[in-house]
């Protein structure tokens, strides 16, 4: 069954529950440190409000016990500033207070309901039919006429707010969800040569992306960066030194070294590994050829080197499509930002360009790189879609 979108929804004067992902970094004082995720959902919310819908926003923020576990009042205030429509806040999610807040909305008004993760059900994975019986869905659904899921970044999860409402309400994909599915599901239809850039510190995810792309003929080239590159270098027998080797084994990435070796044996011509790396020496960036490794003492490999950036830029210049997943180094540190900035700058010049979410999107914002066709809002969800893994929240919409 095809997923319905906002094009199929008659929204006027109807109460629409909209699940978004506005989980954002907070300042020490509890304010919003970055509103990128809120901005991502503005088009969906604005379209519904312009159509005179009465919008109830559902979202989560942080985890219990964490510094960023907070009420959504500040999120409501920010959405009120971003949208050309009134947005209020309700400190309830599915109780009588929440239902009354929805009932009191005039057409073209929105209310942000309280953090769904204040309730234990949102920490449990449910089959959709079981999710429909939870207190959250059972309590709030009677106040709603329809449900819109725009939370692609949470689509790999199966909590009640994501998979329960489609069991009991007409349900639709929002504009963020629609754009993400179109972009990330359509990689096989993009022009070739097609190059994947994999990096970051989430090694199993990136290795899986590379393996899937290579085994399914999606990638003509895979440029390996970040901690992922360290794992691949280790698979070729390169001694990374004590610090980087310990980092790999402390995270139980030893099995990924074996998997990298298998990929190199099967797809050596398509895989591109760094020829030089960067470490910190006497407070400065020091670049070393991979032939000159291991580095001295406790020096850790924290970035790819400039020769690698140049080599990867040449591959990207000959590519028609690029899929980027993961930064090339510790880009938050100016000493080790060059690799990520250089590779991402080159990738942004490719005719067709798709970027995974999470740290990749954060790096793009940090370096103010423009030109990418699609920058995903999702980390784990983007990985699942790029590897054909399950997305329960998407399946629930079908």
UniProtKB/Swiss-Prot annotation:
GO terms for biological process: gluconeogenesis; glycolytic process. It is an enzyme of class 2 (transferase). It is found in: Cytoplasm. Gene3D superfamilies: Phosphoglycerate kinase, N-terminal domain. One of its GO terms (molecular function) is phosphoglycerate kinase activity. Substrate binds at residues 21-23, 37, 60-63, 117, 157. It holds the Pfam family PGK. Keywords: ATP-binding, Cytoplasm, Glycolysis, Kinase, Nucleotide-binding, Transferase. InterPro entries: Phosphoglycerate_kinase, Phosphoglycerate_kinase_N, Phosphoglycerate_kinase_sf. Pathway: Carbohydrate degradation; glycolysis; pyruvate from D-glyceraldehyde 3-phosphate: step 2/5. Its EC number is 2.7.2.3. It catalyses: (2R)-3-phosphoglycerate + ATP = (2R)-3-phospho-glyceroyl phosphate + ADP. GO terms for cellular component: cytosol. ATP binds at residues 332, 357-360. Monomer. PANTHER family: PHOSPHOGLYCERATE KINASE, PHOSPHOGLYCERATE KINASE 1, CHLOROPLASTIC-RELATED. Belongs to the phosphoglycerate kinase family. This is Phosphoglycerate kinase. It comes from Halobacterium salinarum (strain ATCC 700922 / JCM 11081 / NRC-1).
